[in-house]
Structure formats: structure tokens, C-alpha cells
Curated annotation (Swiss-Prot):
Annotated CDD domains: AsxRS_core, EcAsnRS_like_N
Catalytic activity: tRNA(Asn) + L-asparagine + ATP = L-asparaginyl-tRNA(Asn) + AMP + diphosphate + H(+)
EC class (word): ligase
The protein's name in its UniProt record: Asparagine--tRNA ligase
Subunit record text: Homodimer.
UniProt keyword NAD present: no
EC number: 6.1.1.22
Family: Belongs to the class-II aminoacyl-tRNA synthetase family.
GO BP annotations listed: asparaginyl-tRNA aminoacylation
Organism this protein belongs to: Pectobacterium atrosepticum (strain SCRI 1043 / ATCC BAA-672) (Erwinia carotovora subsp. atroseptica)
Highest taxon listed in the record's lineage: Bacteria
């Protein structure tokens, strides 16, 4: 007996007339008047289920087969045969059906065979991967993650595991989750009445990381080309379709690289991973195009074949001011472009992905390299048609005096960044990098509108279930 995944049978990788066993869950069961049952079995290896044809001459047909309902787990042995019906090329002529697990009460089973609202599925996040939608999202998420690692490996990058607990605020925004073992009901105090964090586990204030970038830079200054890929955390009280409190980030850091170098890297990365999804997840993408977003496949195909446009922030503002379109958010030099501005540039003006460069220093982080004009920094955003910003990056400030000036300007204590400043004291180099939010990437690929539905267990304000 050979146990095989459903995908191998459906894709013809198992010889016709072979006896195999598949293990999975019942999606549907229908019975014919001729005493034959058709069981759709899925195991998550691909989008489509495998049809098992079960005759009533099986010894447990009456007691087990006719009691099967959506969600029951089964182990079915049979012969692979060409399917005479539409919808699949192969099916399984069952010779044995073993019920591994029953659904206690089919009438109250939360994942009964019907369409559920996306809001309802969030309430049963432990069961929602059994649905077509979330199962497809999970496979695409996996394929994207594998493609990202593959891209960087093939291009000579080293993956660096950066810490989740940190004492540094990379973005300087202060929206961080505190990590503490202090007794909240009996906090130690200093003579000034403040919380005495010297008594805490780490002997100082500690937080969940908002970015692996600063730590990644230390390894780029030794290994040249590195990237991080891991969870990050923002205590931002935002209840929007684009925000999560816990999400994953991809952050390459490249030694001796300019802003233009990492803009090219961003373009190559996105095109590589999008092509991987088109090649490897055709069945799931066909589902997204049919049920979620009819442009899901064509959007990726067009993206892969498009040349990225490039524009300076100052010129982008001029384009927006002179386009004749009314925006909800005002446009002026110095404003942080909103999603509607970004989408106009990518969808209406350039009609292609676009890299906006050289932003005003006042709306960007302390570590971004100051340009010669003293007003802008070497920062970039990659804007994609259909979503807006998908990547944010910059050339990092490698000059110690300029970095110290920015820290002071932004009210940050340079002593807190002593180790980061050391990189500028000992063999400093120009270097650049960017951040790519993984969940926003998945949402863009699948057409799923809310990032809460592209991560297994979303963490949002007032929600940390499961």
C-alpha cells in the first residue's frame, strides 16, 4: 500500500491502475440511486479534492460511508482510474474506506459545506484553513516564502536571524510592545517615582522588535549581502485592512549599495516571487481569479512583464498637483503620500510599478542618508498598481556625524544606539536596504482585501485569540 498526496493523483504522477491510499478530510459526499457514493477528499496538498467512487458492496458502506459528512477524516484505499466525469482527469475506485475521525454533530459543525463570510471565519480561525479560501491563501503564502528564500540564496545572500526582543526603536515612532516580567500590581519605583526597569528581567526597558533592520545592518557590514525574514510587532491602534500588530517582514541589507542598487533588487525580487506563484500555484490562483479578484492572475502577469518607472518625490508631488484630480488628502511638498496618491501615480499616471525616491527628511526615519540638498533623504517607496506602497527602503546614513545630527534632531539618545554608531566608527561603508511586508505582499498576490485573512492567527487591537 502506497500513501500518496492528492496532488500526485490529480496531476498524473501516479500510474493508472496503481493501488494507493489517500488520507484527508471529506469535503462533500453525494449518493446515487445506483448504490454508489462519490466522496470528495482533500488533504491540503492542492486546491482540488480527489473524487473517490465507493460502491455499496463495501462491508462498511451502510454503517460508515453513508454517515460521512463534511469534515470527517478518512483513509481511502483504491485504484487510480481515468475519470469519465468533468472536473478531474483521475479518480479513485475505492476498495476500502476507513473512517479515522467523525464530526461530532454535523448540524453544528462550524465549517459545514456552505459559503461563510470572511468575518465569521476570523471567529473560527482554528478551523478556517479547511475552507477553500484560507487553504489557498496558506499554500500561496508558503510558495511566496520559499521563493523569497530561494531568490536570496541564488543571489548570494545570507539569511540572518535577528532578535525579537530589543531595546532599540528602529523607526523612532514609539509604538512598541513592552516586554517585562515585573509584577504589574507591585511595580518597583525609583526615587523620582518612575518604574525602576533596572529590576526587570533584562535590567532595562525591553520591547518586541518593530524591525530587524538595525541588527541586519551589523551583519551586512561583515557578510556583505544579508536578509532577515521574521515576525515584527507594532503597537499601533489601527483597525484597518492594512494593519496588523504582528506581521512578517523581509528586510535585505546590502553592503556598498546605493539607493538605485536596492531599487533594482526590489524589482528583481518581486518579479521572481510573482513568477514563482504563477508557475507553482496555478490552481489556487485560478480560484482567486474566479472568486476573489478577477484581476489576480493578469495583475501578476502584467507586473512581471512591466519595467518599473522611477520618479523623485518632488516631481511626484508636481504630478499630483497638476493632474486635475480631487484627492481626499491634500497634496503639498512635505506631505507623506497617502494610499490614494500612491495608487494614482501607479495606476493612472505611470500605469506601471513605480519607485518614488528622495523624500523629505522630516517624514522619514533617522537612519536614512541625508542628500546634499539638506532637505531630503535617500529613501524610496515601491508603489504597485492595485495597492500602493509595497516596499519601503533607503540608503543608510554611513557618516557618523550626520547620523548623530539626525538622532539629536529627532530627540533620540545616541547612547541608546552606541552599537549602531560603532558601525560608522570602524570601517564604515555605504549600504542600503528595504523592508517588504509579507502579509501585504500576500494580499496583493491573492486579491484578498484584508491582511487579517492572509496570516494564520491575526493579532489586532483587542484581539489575541487562539
Amino acid at each position: 500500500m502506497s500513501v500518496v498526496p492528492v496532488v500526485d493523483v490529480l496531476q498524473g504522477r501516479v500510474a493508472v491502475d496503481s493501488e494507493v491510499t489517500v488520507r484527508g478530510w471529506v469535503r462533500t459526499r453525494r449518493d446515487s440511486k445506483a448504490g454508489i457514493s462519490f466522496i470528495a477528499v482533500y488533504d491540503g496538498s492542492c486546491f482540488n479534492p480527489l473524487q473517490a467512487v465507493v460502491n455499496n458492496n463495501l462491508s462498511n458502506y451502510q454503517d460508515d460511508v453513508l454517515r460521512l459528512t463534511t469534515g470527517c477524516s478518512v483513509e481511502i484505499t483504491g485504484n487510480v482510474v481515468a475519470s469519465p466525469g468533468e472536473g478531474q482527469s483521475f479518480e479513485l475506485q475505492a476498495t476500502n474506506v476507513n473512517v479515522v475521525g467523525w464530526v461530532d454533530d454535523p448540524d453544528t459543525y462550524p465549517m459545514a459545506a456552505k459559503r461563510h463570510s470572511i468575518e465569521y471565519l476570523r471567529e473560527v480561525a482554528h478551523l478556517r484553513p479547511r475552507t477553500n479560501l484560507i487553504g489557498a491563501v496558506a499554500r500561496v503564502r508558503h510558495t511566496l516564502a520559499q521563493a523569497i528564500h530561494r531568490f536570496f540564496h541564488e543571489n548570494g545572500y545570507f539569511w540572518v536571524s535577528t532578535p525579537l526582543i530589543t531595546a532599540s526603536d528602529t523607526e523612532g515612532a514609539g509604538e512598541m510592545f513592552r516586554v517585562s516580567t515585573l509584577d504589574m500590581e507591585n511595580l518597583p519605583r525609583t526615587e523620582q517615582g518612575k518604574v525602576d526597569f533596572s529590576k526587570d528581567f533584562f535590567g532595562k526597558e525591553a520591547f518586541l522588535t518593530v524591525s530587524g533592520q538595525l541588527n541586519g545592518e551589523t551583519y551586512a557590514c561583515a557578510l556583505s549581502n544579508v536578509y532577515t525574514f521574521g515576525p515584527t510587532f507594532r503597537a499601533e491602534n489601527s483597525n484597518t485592512a492594512r494593519h496588523l500588530a504582528e506581521f512578517w517582514m523581509i528586510e535585505p541589507e546590502v553592503a556598498f549599495a546605493s539607493l538605485d542598487d536596492v531599487a533594482a533588487l526590489a524589482e528583481n525580487l518581486l518579479k521572481y516571487v510573482f513568477q514563482a506563484v504563477l508557475n507553482e500555484r496555478a490552481d489556487d490562483m485560478a480560484f482567486f481569479a474566479e472568486r476573489v479578484d478577477k484581476e489576480a492572475v493578469t495583475r501578476l502577469e502584467k507586473f512581471v512583464s512591466s519595467d518599473f518607472a522611477q520618479v523623485d518625490y518632488t516631481d511626484a508631488v508636481e504630478i499630483l498637483l497638476n493632474c486635475g484630480q480631487q484627492f481626499e488628502n491634500p497634496v503639498y511638498w512635505g506631505v507623506d503620500l497617502s494610499s490614494e496618491h500612491e495608487r494614482y501615480l501607479a495606476e493612472q499616471h505611470f500605469k506601471a510599478p513605480v519607485v518614488v525616491k528622495n523624500y523629505p527628511k522630516d517624514i522619514k526615519a533617522f537612519y536614512m542618508r541625508m542628500n546634499d540638498d539638506g532637505k531630503t533623504v535617500a529613501a524610496m517607496d515601491v508603489l504597485a498598481p492595485g495597492i500602493g506602497e509595497i516596499i519601503g527602503g533607503s540608503q543608510r546614513e554611513e557618516r557618523l556625524a550626520a547620523l548623530d545630527s539626525r538622532l539629536e534632531e529627532m530627540g533620540l539618545n545616541k547612547e541608546d544606539y552606541w552599537w549602531y554608531r560603532d558601525l560608522r566608527r570602524y570601517g564604515t561603508i555605504p549600504h542600503s536596504g528595504f523592508g517588504l511586508g509579507f502579509e501585504r505582499l500576500i494580499a496583493y498576490v491573492t486579491g484578498v482585501q484584508n491582511v487579517r485573512d492572509v496570516i494564520p492567527f491575526p493579532r489586532t487591537p483587542r484581539n489575541a485569540s487562539f
